[in-house]
């Protein structure tokens, strides 16, 4: 059933569609096409453009991977790593470090990913450490 439909589209409908297209005999004939004729040509030209792009895409230059950008642009730039430690009385666990570089695989908990980021970019971002306040 599916192959019959596909065969009908390829053998009957596609040739009939191509015969009805208003393709001019010369390049100058494209200037004389009306708006409705251009609209009838648009799907065909779109498919041709897509096929052309897919044909040349393997030969196009690859995009360069963008270098990591700095996260901390101005806070405590004189320190090698910005780490803030906050004492909280109601904290259930003794100490927890939260990520501020957005690169942690265990986000929101810090896993030390900022160290590699800092090496690559020269940044000084570090975690936010919450510590249980000793009463």
From Swiss-Prot:
Transmembrane intervals? 38-60
From which source organism is this entry? Aquarana catesbeiana (American bullfrog)
Q: Where does [2Fe-2S] cluster bind?
A: 99, 101, 110, 114
One molecular function GO term is: protein homodimerization activity
**Swiss-Prot/TrEMBL cofactor(s):** [2Fe-2S] cluster
How many cofactors are bound and how? Binds 1 [2Fe-2S] cluster.
Keywords from the named record: 2Fe-2S, Autophagy, Endoplasmic reticulum, Iron, Iron-sulfur, Membrane, Metal-binding, Mitochondrion, Mitochondrion outer membrane, Transmembrane, Transmembrane helix
Subunit text: Homodimer.
Q: Name the InterPro entries for this protein.
A: CISD1/2 (IPR045131), FeS-contain_CDGSH-typ (IPR018967), FeS-contain_mitoNEET_N (IPR019610), MitoNEET_CISD (IPR042216)
Q: What does this protein do?
A: Regulator of autophagy that contributes to antagonize becn1-mediated cellular autophagy at the endoplasmic reticulum. Participates in the interaction of bcl2 with becn1 and is required for bcl2-mediated depression of endoplasmic reticulum Ca(2+) stores during autophagy.
Q: Name one GO biological process term.
A: regulation of autophagy
Protein name per Swiss-Prot or TrEMBL: CDGSH iron-sulfur domain-containing protein 2
Task: Give residue ranges on the Cytoplasmic side.
Answer: 61-135
Q: Which family does it belong to?
A: Belongs to the CISD protein family. CISD2 subfamily.
The lineage, from the top, is: Eukaryota, Metazoa, Chordata, Craniata, Vertebrata
Q: Note one Pfam family from the annotation.
A: MitoNEET_N
Q: What is its main location?
A: endoplasmic reticulum
User: Which cystines does this chain contain?
Assistant: none
Q: Which GO terms describe its cellular component?
A: endoplasmic reticulum membrane; mitochondrial outer membrane
Keyword Metal-binding part of the UniProt annotation: yes
Query: Domain of life, per the record?
Result: Eukaryota
> Subcellular location, in the record's words?
Endoplasmic reticulum membrane; Mitochondrion outer membrane
Topological domain spans for side Lumenal = 1-37
